């Protein structure tokens, strides 16, 4: 998949650094993709651009960079563009169409009306839910059998 715009959302803002490190290790060095985030956990980190800096890089270098963006679920739910009572922030996320939204740690905090509202406001083609412990979602039948991929430590041996 040659996704142009990817958004990673998690209920744990503290794992932002892990996503950034994996991006650097596996993607940044081989693809014309930039990492974009305005979350406090990533402010000032090398290689992390604000959305405005991303747009300027595309214009100034006359290059169509692809984007991997990171935002916390709390950040989305605090935005007027994704919540009924939010403040004016993250308009750039509301304005974009994402080829893929990755919901990391999807067993946490995504089964709420506010989250449903936020995700419903987002323009996205595909959603990937990641979880190491999706017990509730599987028990409820949230996903069809062909939508579930299992991998265990035993599979790595």
Predicted regions and their residues:
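Conserved Walker A/P-loop ATP-binding site and its immediately adjacent core
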Residues: 2-28, 32-34, 38-40, 73-75
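Conserved acidic residues
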Residues: 4, 67, 99, 125, ...
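Structural motif
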Residues: 7-9, 68-72, 100-102
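Switch/connector loops and helix/strand junctions flanking conserved nucleotide-binding motifs
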Residues: 16-19, 43-45, 78-80, 136-141
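Short secondary-structure boundary/capping segments
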Residues: 22-26, 84-87, 116-117, 141-147
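Inter-Walker segment of RecA-like/P-loop motor cores
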Residues: 30-84
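SF2 helicase catalytic motif II
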Residues: 73-80, 87-129, 133-136
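Interdomain hinge/linker at the junction between the two RecA-like core domains of SF2 helicases
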Residues: 144-157
